[in-house]
Amino acid sequence: MLDFNQHSKFHERVTSHIDASLDAERAEQKARTYLGASRLGVECERALQYEYAGAPNDLGRGFSGRILRIFEVGHVMEELAVRWLRMAGFELHNQKPDGGQFGFSAAAGRLQGHVDGIITAAPPELGLSFPMLFECKTMADKHWKACAKSGVAVTKPVYAAQMAT
């Protein structure tokens, strides 16, 4: 029998509105004229060339609303991690005096990147050397466990490249 009263679930309808707004926000962002250093761990050189050239994504192959939500959660978690580290006695600088991120550029500006922060001091009993870069990564529990077991380089090679850049 056909059910003409079937509707998507409430949370799915709300999420579709959120995703559409995130898609619209992303569409308004100015396109990069450089290759982001966070992409250096991507193995497919052709994909990197297309990205650098500004080729459009294949239909349905861009960042979905779900992925954009995950990115936003990562930014919020980064803010919390910075706060917690500072509370624990770390001197962590995550913005320049003008408010922008610390960044770098190579290859006449064709390659650019940013760091999440720079740590210049920590509790002495940790025995750390300074300065050191701070890179904050978030991931689902199953990915975290895989990284703990096999290492970031094996489990998340793109993350490993980002942290090493």
Language model features with spans:
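Metal-dependent nuclease catalytic cores that hydrolyze phosphodiester bonds in DNA/RNA
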Residues: 1-133, 140-142, 146-153, 157
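Residue-level detection of beta-strand scaffold positions
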Residues: 133-134, 163
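Membrane-associated lipid acylation/remodeling enzymes share a hydrophobic transmembrane-juxtamembrane segment
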Residues: 155-165
